[in-house]
Swiss-Prot record:
Keywords: Acetylation, Electron transport, Heme, Iron, Metal-binding, Mitochondrion, Respiratory chain, Transport. One of its GO terms (molecular function) is heme binding. InterPro entries: Cyt_c-like_dom (IPR009056), Cyt_c-like_dom_sf (IPR036909), Cyt_c_1A/1B (IPR002327). Binds 1 heme c group covalently per subunit. It holds the Pfam family Cytochrom_C. Heme c binds at C22, C25, H26, M88. It is found in: Mitochondrion intermembrane space. This is Cytochrome c. The lineage of its organism: Eukaryota, Viridiplantae, Streptophyta, Embryophyta, Tracheophyta. Coiled coil: none annotated. The keyword NAD does not apply. One of its GO terms (cellular component) is mitochondrial intermembrane space. Belongs to the cytochrome c family. The modification N-acetylalanine is found at A1.
Amino acid sequence: ASFAEAPPGNPKAGEKIFKTKCAQCHTVEKGAGHKQGPNLNGLFGRQSGTTAGYSYSAANKNMAVIWEESTLYDYLLNPXKYIPGTKMVFPGLXKPQERADLIAYLKESTA
């Protein structure tokens, strides 16, 4: 199912998901720097593999996807299938509600 069919996202629920499943490797605050994964500040509208100062896989750079709700929704279902060769080891979020919640949180927290 596509993002157009996704349930409405709850940013508060998304923040909990981020803290338990994403924050070990990612930051969202401007100027927070990179961890194992890149800082996600300014994520929406940015091309994959282009965050300054982070060493991306060739797969992530070559995919050249623009991160928006619809691309993140598909990516977060199964990152390794969406971008084969990505360094992101996260297996994905199978539940549409969890993906919608996380995207709602990321829209607020990375702007």
